[in-house]
Regions:
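RNase H-like, Mg2+-dependent phosphodiesterase core
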Residues: 1-221
Length: 221
């Protein structure tokens, strides 16, 4: 086992402490200059089976390997969802509130599927709990308990699974968007900043999917 291999150690500890289910949560697209931010959620029960072979944080996997793992992760997690906040919502609300909105939408999708979210413990990647305040702003949404862990996407299998779900979902959206708004090379850059992406904005102007507040000032004109 290498340092990059996640385990179920934290999840099983939460189950021993009484959690009825664990929801791994991770986001993708936080730093992009085009497209939505996506939050993946993977739901796991105390009888969780061995994770798919080769599962890792999505950032450590090739695009091909993520696509190969995606159906395995969907089969492994009893329930899953991906919530989105659009580029316009990120511009209007800011990235942290946008992340919260996307996560709330994902949680609402789980609730609609019959998942007892209020009995869950959410494992959130990072040191900052941006989810609890978002839930507090939505009194009609079920509120799970949230715990944070730095490098959870690397170390915790539930969060690694969520990262793959979010990354594949968002990447597919950006590839489709490349056909609608050609020229920005979204099939390759997935909406993230690069010299060629900024050059395309200078040449074509910003599209309806760009985050205007995130663009470098010279690229706006």
């Amino acid at each position: 086992m290498t340092a990059a291999d996640p385990t179920l150690r934290m999840e099983r500890g939460l189950f021993r402490d009484g959690a009825a289910l664990v929801i791994g949560v991770d986001e993708v697209g936080r730093g992009a200059i085009a497209g939505p931010v996506a939050v993946g959620l993977g739901v796991f029960l105390p009888d969780v089976k061995r994770m798919p072979k080769g599962l890792r944080d999505s950032k450590l996997l090739s695009e091909q390997r993520r696509e190969e793992l995606h159906p395995e992760v969907l089969a492994w997690a009893p329930h899953s969802a991906v919530g989105l906040a659009s580029n316009a919502e990120v511009d209007t609300l800011g990235i942290i509130a946008g992340l919260g909105l996307a996560a709330v939408r994902g949680i609402e999708a789980l609730v609609a599927a019959g998942v007892p979210v209020e009995a869950a413990v959410v494992v959130l990647d990072g040191s900052h709990d941006w989810l609890t305040p978002a839930l507090a702003d939505c009194p009609d949404t079920s509120r799970p308990r949230v715990v944070t862990r730095v490098k959870a996407d690397r170390d915790c299998a539930s969060v690694a699974a969520a990262s793959v779900l979010a990354k594949v979902h968002r990447d597919r959206l950006m590839i489709d968007a490349d056909g609608v708004h050609p020229g920005y090379e979204w099939t390759s850059n997935k909406g993230y900043a690069s010299a060629t992406h900024y050059a395309a904005i200078d040449r074509l102007g910003a599209s309806a999917l760009h985050r205007w507040s995130w663009l470098k000032q010279p690229a706006l004109f």
